[in-house]
Design a protein with these regions (language model features):
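ATP/NTP phosphate-donor binding region
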Residues: 1-62
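Alpha-helix N-cap/helix-start motif
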Residues: 13-14, 74-75, 115-116, 160
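Short Gly/Thr/Asp-enriched flexible loops that form oxyanion-binding sites at enzyme active sites
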Residues: 19-20, 49-51, 71-85, 117-118
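General beta-strand structural signal in soluble alpha/beta enzymes
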Residues: 33-34, 64, 74, 106-107, ...
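Alpha-helical hydrophobic/aromatic positions enriched in membrane-embedded helices and signal peptides
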Residues: 35, 59-61, 65, 100, ...
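Glycine/serine-rich anion-binding loops at beta->alpha junctions
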Residues: 59-78, 109-115
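A glycine/threonine-rich phosphate-anchoring loop and its flanking beta-alpha core
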Residues: 83-169
């Protein structure tokens, strides 16, 4: 079974999303899709909400994440949480994950965060109002697909923000 995690902005604004859906059409019986809400930065609470739903899917083989840095972080973290029980916040910090997650394929639609190739995923801890990460060897994507055509659907403001993000790293 495959899980496609995609942010709503990609669904609304990218013709490439439809191409991916067409490519995966032959797997429709084993494909599940979750569209992430895009009204705020992802929090540990939201991560736990989505991970709770995903953990109920038996025999999940791979997660495909499509979107900006936050969506890619969600996809990577959900891969890890599928095999590591409990609330996500207990894995905050470095190398607190016990088991490797299931395989992931990350397709970024912005250039700058590099989330698809890092061992970090950042979420907001609402109790502290801070962005803190789950970091470590089990947080990297299995595969990253980089295609400049995906960047064409990125809004100008997001391109500017992610470009600045790349410069400050």
């Amino acid at each position: 079974k495959m899980l496609l995690i995609v942010d709503r902005g990609v669904v609304k604004n990218s013709s490439y999303y439809n191409k991916i859906k067409m490519l995966l059409k032959k797997y429709k019986d084993s494909l599940i899709e979750i569209q992430l809400r895009d009204d705020e930065e992802p929090s540990y609470d939201y991560l736990d909400e989505v991970a709770g739903k995903v953990r109920k899917i038996p025999n999940l083989d791979v997660i495909i994440g499509i979107g900006g840095g936050s969506s890619i972080d969600m996809a990577k973290a959900i891969c890890a949480l599928y095999t590591n029980p409990g609330l996500s916040i207990k894995y905050r910090g470095f190398d607190n994950l016990v088991s490797p997650g299931i395989p992931s394929i990350c397709i970024p639609t912005t250039a700058g965060t590099g989330s698809e190739v890092t061992v970090n995923a950042v979420f907001t801890d609402k109790s502290q109002m801070k962005k803190l990460g789950i970091n470590g060897r089990y947080m990297s994507a299995t595969y990253a697909i980089l295609d400049a055509k995906w960047l064409q659907s990125c809004p100008k403001s997001a391109s500017i923000s992610s470009g600045m993000d790349a410069l400050v790293h």
